[in-house]
């Protein structure tokens, strides 16, 4: 989330000064926005320039919320960081269009809108808005061409509904692909499928991702170091990559922007085993 906000703050991203943090009411959006609010404070953004809103799962009436966003945006260059979940994204973007809020005026960056979510929906209200992922199908790289080809061949051979005629790849698929290949490498290194031996062998594993960039599993916490891409939604449901990190971002399981994480190292918390009876 932080790289996406840094992009929107930049000249290339529009130079946003005011922020709407809009999400579905559950733990991921609330934790993300807690981190983002603290990050924005560190950049000199005042609470008066941050508007935080939540809606229940399945929410579909965004008329009032979009009207509030439009009013808030009148106070200065505004961007929306969306952690809206699932089907609620469609009515939200539709209402933005109804209200005349265009991406060039109030850009929205989402963390749950990808190629699969855009399949079969009217993309007109979404064109120009943004999404942040570690992978997009449109990335130009030989490794990605090969990845898409493999999936296309498999989907057709297995007659997979929705993919046999129009195969799509997305971020969760890429993450699974990386994870499985790293696991296979670890099994080979360990010379065993024993869980503890494989876990130990996973530390430090590297793999060239479909993005063409080498991902690494952190030696201490087993989170991946991955690149971040910002993509602009196109009419065909694909993304035009407009920005990316210079390289993989180091895994950081304990955000320094949450006060209770102060002093925690980027490694797992060791919990003592319960005494045997």
Please annotate each region the language model reported:
Residues 2, 30, 90, 174-181, ...:
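A structural signal for well-ordered alpha-helical segments within the folded catalytic domains
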Residues 16, 188-200:
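Short, charged, surface-exposed loops that flank catalytic or proteolytic processing sites
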Residues 23-26, 135, 186:
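Residue-level signal for short, function-critical loop segments
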Residues 24, 111-113, 235:
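Cofactor-binding loop segments of dinucleotide-utilizing enzymes, especially the Rossmann-like FAD-
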């Amino acid at each position: 989330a932080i790289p996406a906000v840094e992009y929107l703050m930049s000249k290339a991203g529009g130079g946003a000064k005011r922020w709407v943090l809009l999400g579905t009411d559950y733990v991921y959006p609330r934790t993300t926005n807690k981190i983002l609010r603290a990050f924005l404070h560190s950049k000199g953004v005042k609470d008066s320039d941050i508007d935080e809103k939540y809606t229940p799962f399945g929410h579909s009436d965004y008329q009032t919320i979009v009207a509030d966003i439009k009013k808030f945006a009148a106070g200065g260059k505004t961007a929306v960081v969306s952690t809206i979940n699932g089907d609620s994204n469609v009515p939200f973007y539709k209402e933005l269009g109804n209200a005349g809020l265009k991406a060039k005026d109030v850009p929205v960056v989402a963390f749950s809108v990808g190629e699969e979510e855009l399949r079969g929906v009217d993309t007109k209200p979404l064109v120009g808005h943004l999404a942040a992922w570690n992978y997009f199908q449109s990335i130009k790289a030989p490794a990605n061409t090969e990845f898409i080809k493999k999936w296309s061949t498999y989907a057709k051979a297995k007659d997979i509904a929705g993919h046999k005629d129009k195969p799509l790849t997305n971020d969760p698929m890429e993450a699974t692909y990386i994870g499985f290949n790293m696991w296979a490498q670890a099994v080979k290194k360990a010379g065993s499928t024993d869980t503890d031996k494989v876990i130990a062998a996973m530390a430090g594993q590297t793999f060239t991702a479909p993005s063409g960039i080498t991902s690494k599993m952190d030696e201490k916490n087993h989170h991946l170091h991955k690149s971040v891409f910002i993509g602009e939604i196109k009419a065909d449901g694909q993304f035009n990559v407009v920005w990316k990190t210079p390289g993989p971002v180091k895994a950081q399981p304990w955000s320094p922007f949450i006060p209770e994480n102060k002093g925690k190292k980027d490694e797992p918390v060791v919990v003592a085993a319960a005494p045997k009876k």
